[in-house]
Amino acid sequence: MQNQGVFILAIESSCDDTAAAVLYNDKVLSNVVANQLIHNQYGGVVPELASRAHQQNIVPVIDAALKKAGITKEQLSAIAFTQGPGLMGSLLVGSSFAKSLSTALNIPLVAVNHMHAHILAHFIDEEGYEKPEFPFLALTRSEERRVGKECLRLCR
């Protein structure tokens, strides 16, 4: 049987933006982001407000990503989601949705480290992606205190 390709739904909910992207093999078909502007009035992200907004945004964002990609959820081959680091309540919304949908569709679920994704996303472009040569050194900044350990693990 010939390989027909792989559709992946990627879900991001680590802080205050709810995002979903659909990829076909190495091409990004859609990328939909719902911003949470409510935090501007507080001078920073309020975790409780962020998780509540994710609950409101996750279904419309994923529906929009699938529609923009021109596929149905039944065509998905796998679901990837942010497992951390990030705000616990926000992460729980994304991970719970991803786990439920993957179970309902009986497709694989892939947990993704947020900081690894920041680093590796630079290798994706509209024409596909060029694989990095491992090991490599990367530097990233985050408010998380344990990020240094995670980056070292990726680069080994």
Report the location of each language-model feature.
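N-terminal beta-alpha supersecondary unit
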Residues: G5-Q75, F81-P85, H114
